[in-house]
Amino acid sequence: MDSCNEPAILFHKTLNKKLENYVHSLQEIQNKHVSDFALYTPINSVQSFLARYELMKMIQDIPGAVVEMGVCSGNGLLSLFHCHNILQPTYKYREFYGFDTFEGFPEVHKNDISHIKWEKGDFANDSYDKLLNLISVHSNYCYAAPNVKLVKGDVNETLPKLLEENKHIIVSLLYLDLDIYEPTKTALHYLLPKMAKGSIVAFDELNWKSFPGETIAALEELGTKYKFKNLLNSGINYCVIE
């Protein structure tokens, strides 16, 4: 064996072992062959992932944090995280923030009234601890993993507090998946001033009959001066701050 190749061979073996441990850790959590995701994943889930990939492509040269409002199970947040690590694996300055009560809707406003009667506690998802573990597993495999912070509690209270304690924060992508009026309006009110030209606001339930509150909040805070666009015929819509 050529001794000049030994460091490269050792590096390759170490990388393969790291990948093996990474996949094994995920399979222990999920108890499935996670590498075979295309066999089991519904096409709409692939569509949503690719839509988030397109969003992350758009902000590659825009500095600032990625903020998801309404984490729920964490699928959306980790999709954005994965897309970042695919597109910018060595860029460690991108911070990720995920907000959720993890106890469902805090309150329901009159602007949320639709043909469905939403109530306090709807969409509760006790995923906080599991999600922290998954973030750690994925981050350990990344070359330069960005900081990912879960913010637990009512956005109306947690967001102003976080911004007061972290005055450096600017936002490159704000992904709104809160569904209802008040927290969506709060998020836009506090974060739009933190968004430079070229930054993106994305909506998960814009123009949805079941969730009128999100659209009402968007129109109140953004007006009609922005051009809303759809991504890949999915439920995800966005506008670019100009």
Residues of each region from the PLM?
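Conserved alpha-helix/loop element of class I SAM-dependent methyltransferases that forms part
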Residues: 50-61
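S-adenosylmethionine/decaboxylated-SAM
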Residues: 12-43, 60, 64-242
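N-terminal auxiliary segments of SAM/dcSAM-dependent transferases
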Residues: 1-16
